[in-house]
UniProtKB/Swiss-Prot annotation:
InterPro entries: ATP-Sase_PUA-like_dom, PUA-like_sf, Rossmann-like_a/b/a_fold, SO4_adenylyltransferase_pro, Sulfurylase_cat_dom, Sulphate_adenylyltransferase. Pathway: Sulfur metabolism; hydrogen sulfide biosynthesis; sulfite from sulfate: step 1/3. GO terms for molecular function: ATP binding; sulfate adenylyltransferase (ATP) activity. Its EC number is 2.7.7.4. This is Sulfate adenylyltransferase. GO terms for biological process: hydrogen sulfide biosynthetic process; sulfate assimilation. It comes from Syntrophobacter fumaroxidans (strain DSM 10017 / MPOB). Keywords: ATP-binding, Nucleotide-binding, Nucleotidyltransferase, Transferase. CDD domains: ATPS (cd00517). Belongs to the sulfate adenylyltransferase family. Transmembrane segments: none annotated. It is an enzyme of class 2 (transferase). It catalyses: sulfate + ATP + H(+) = adenosine 5'-phosphosulfate + diphosphate.
């Protein structure tokens, strides 16, 4: 019997919505006959997360009561904790053409593929600004990429249970790293792990990430380096490059069999504290008992305080999650200490510290600069330098307060 933390929800069982075998073949044929609802890249990635059971216990895209409950008090209509709305929008003409309980095919527009079907049980409109203020803590569509996506949603939300018929390109393009929750749980069980810490990544690992990871390795049975292979914002490093960079780091600087690397298909929302909670929910579904929450988790720009994503775990209803946050303070290289340290372990001043950030790594390398040796391992830097050298078009990367340390610790 598994010793891992059970999945999220009342039933404490994974709820994958991805069809297999004869049911899959039949649904694929049926989908060809249905009205088509186009999905954005975020909606498509959410559908795949539903399919693999990462969004257990959801059975589809949310209706109005769940949307409102999640925005206002982190709970769905049935009382189950959930931090961010998972919704599907359609333009009014498409929505008007769909009858109640009619089945529709869900099209991933970017990849021109039908990923699933949905029985439309509800159609409703939302206050987009209310969602943005609740989830992102801002309505700044010009500066915040997550807000911009919500404000660009179509006029009507469609809700109902889904059946997923494809995981898109993820299983083939990322075949050595992409995992479903059931697959990760099987790997953890085979190793006899019970206490597993997840390290959320959307950047290649620099020395601060490595430091966080090794703290977890010291106190847990194992570490799950779980990186996003879904869509990021412009200027972020692509998943295949990150996978390669993490591989060389784990191979050269971690004890064998203490770390598993995995990938998941969600798209970043950059919702900071609320997204940290979503990361916690689906990491619990993957079998992780803990989530490492460091500085500026899932943030963008200066919209959130550096530790707001840690504080929010203290504000949610008691018992909402079985997974626990592993909260870690500012980490940096201290020249006086002679290595990596944190605010809790280093007594020295700012002048003695080199703050490390993914943004700084990307900016320096994209401009052809040399990173200080304290920033990242040479094997990792080599992978990243090769990537940036091959770019035909350079992307401007702006530094923000959380990347430079010029923020007040709230």
């Amino acid at each position: 019997m598994s010793k891992l933390v059970p999945p999220h929800g009342k039933e404490k069982k994974l709820k994958p919505l991805l069809l297999e075998g004869a049911a899959l073949a039949a649904e694929k044929e049926k989908a060809k006959t249905l009205k088509v609802v186009p999905m954005t890249s975020r909606e498509a990635s959410d559908l795949i997360m539903l399919g693999i059971g990462a969004f257990t216990p959801l059975d589809g895209f949310m209706g109005y009561a769940d949307w409102k409950g999640v925005c206002d008090k982190y709970t769905m209509a049935d009382g189950v904790f959930w931090p961010i709305p998972i919704t599907l929008s359609a333009d009014k003409a498409v929505a008007d053409s769909i009858g109640k309980n009619e089945e529709v095919a869900l099209l991933d527009v970017e990849n021109n593929e039908i990923l699933g079907t949905m029985k439309v049980t509800e159609k409703y409109t939302i206050d987009k600004e209310h969602e943005c203020k609740s989830v992102f803590w801002t309505n700044d569509a010009a500066g915040h990429p997550g807000v911009a996506k919500v404000m660009a949603q179509k006029e009507v939300n469609l809700a109902g249970p889904v059946k997923v018929i494809s995981e898109s390109f993820y299983p083939t393009q990322f075949k050595n790293v992409y995992q479903r929750p059931a697959e990760a749980r099987k790997l953890f069980d085979e190793k006899g792990w019970r206490r597993v810490a997840a390290l959320q990544l959307r950047n290649p690992m620099h020395r601060s990430h490595e430091f966080l990871a090794k703290i977890a390795v010291e106190v847990m049975d194992g570490l799950y380096i779980h990186q996003l292979v879904g869509k990021l914002k412009e200027g972020d490093i692509p998943a295949d490059v990150r996978v390669k960079a993490i591989d060389v780091l784990v191979e050269n600087y971690f004890v064998k069999d203490t770390v598993i690397q995995g990938g998941y298909p969600a798209e970043m929302r950059y919702a900071g504290p609320r997204e940290a909670l979503l990361h916690a929910v689906f990491r619990q579904n993957y079998g992780c008992s803990h989530l490492i929450v460091g500085r500026d988790h899932a943030g963008v720009g200066d919209y959130y305080g550096p530790f707001d994503a840690q504080k929010i775990f203290d504000d949610i209803p008691e018992g909402a999650l079985l997974l626990q946050p592993l909260k870690i303070d500012w980490t940096f290289h201290c020249f006086k200490c002679g290595g990596m340290a944190s605010m809790r372990t280093c007594p020295h001043g700012k002048a003695d510290r080199l703050l490390l950030s993914g943004t700084m790594v990307r900016k320096t390398l994209s401009e052809g600069g040399e990173l200080p040796k304290e920033f990242s391992r040479p094997e990792v830097v080599k992978v990243l330098q090769e990537y940036y050298a091959g770019l035909e078009e350079k992307v401007e990367i702006k530094l923000h307060g959380a990347a430079t340390g010029d923020v007040k610790k709230k």
